[in-house]
Amino acid sequence: MNARIVVAGASMAGLRAAEQLRAAGWTGAITLVGDEPHMPYNRPPLSKEVLAGKAPFESLAFRPRASVSDVEWRLRRRVVSAALDERTVRLDDGSVLSYDALVVATGMRPRRLDCPGPLAGRHTVRTLDDAQGLREELTRPGARVVVVGAGFIGCEVAATAVGLGVAEVTVVDPLPLPMAGPLGELLGRALLARHEDRGVRFALGVGVAGFTGEDRVTGVMLSDGSVVPADVVVESVGSVANTEWLDGNGLDLRDGVLTDELLRVGSRPEVVAVGDVARFPNARYDGVPRRVEHWSIPTDSAKHAAKALMRHLCGEQAELTPFAPLPTFWSDQHDFRLQSFGAPVLGKDDVRVLDGDPDGDVLVGYHRDGRLVGVVALGGQAVAASAARYRTELLKQPALTV
């Protein structure tokens, strides 16, 4: 039997894993399994350009490199179980795939609100089909939109809805400020002011108790007893890792798949995890395992995991350095951009303005024990470029020990 690597998950992380395995010298078979009907595509535009009707699928689709032209694609298929001791996975059509190595790239799915009320009119944004369905509702005349969750996706959806001409857009969140969790108070206040200036309403410091309506949602009941009228609800309340198929294999599946510093899973050198499903210790920081849902992680983790797999499959003895990525993300909202490098969440207790003013374009630094651990720019292209100049400084820093 020919040697084969199975990649469970045909998203960006899965595609990059296949490409990096070829780049690292793997000449055996590669099978990618994905539950969507589409080839891998870029997800960040879903809550922005796709919702706004400015990005057809052709502009989102990744073009696989020639090196993976012989990869076997099993789309519209889902991995439902794994027997790691036997090195097999079972798909939802009953077929069983054996493997010499396994790449876990099954990603996340949106968390749903467990509240009473109708389901019709309630949406999430994770897939192309999600975004296209939501766009149809946002463009209905007179639609009133409530976004539950003031994180990155929630704020992007709210901004896009305003840009489409939706008259009533309300964002609900139990925290006192938008994006307070990852970015802290200073930028949270700046973002709140910018969104309100552009017509977004906020109900902060309250949760969702349920939904009104019979066949379709007509309002959102808040924990303080008030009701916000709504024809469309977008639930942006976090993610759940797609790891149920790995149950029964003795793995730590709390909040993703726990890996070691080389992205190997469960002391099994033939199994690695990549993308936002991987909960890994970042050697650049404090070594505490965390998932990272930023744009740069699929490619960075795929490259490192491919080297770890090839080392095992080829019997190489060369030492590999621990995975130590510098997380990078951006978020376009209205006419401004958030650009981040590093790990701001680790430095929220010591936030300093490095340049500009929170009332305008601003560059903010996040520090831990006096050391810069992340920078975030809010504003136009010039301040985003200023943030990029700090990337080199962040990359040069030694590991943070706590």
Which residue ranges define each predicted feature?
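FAD-binding core/adjacent interface of flavoenzyme oxidoreductases
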Residues: M1-V6, F62-V145, M221-S223, V232-S236, ...
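Mid-to-C-terminal Rossmann-like scaffold of FAD/NAD(P)H-dependent oxidoreductases
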Residues: N2-A3, R279-A382
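Glycine-rich Rossmann-fold phosphate-binding loop(s) that bind the pyrophosphate
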Residues: G9-M12, R126, G149-G151
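A Rossmann-like FAD-binding core segment of flavoenzymes
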Residues: T27, W73-R90, L97, L164-E261
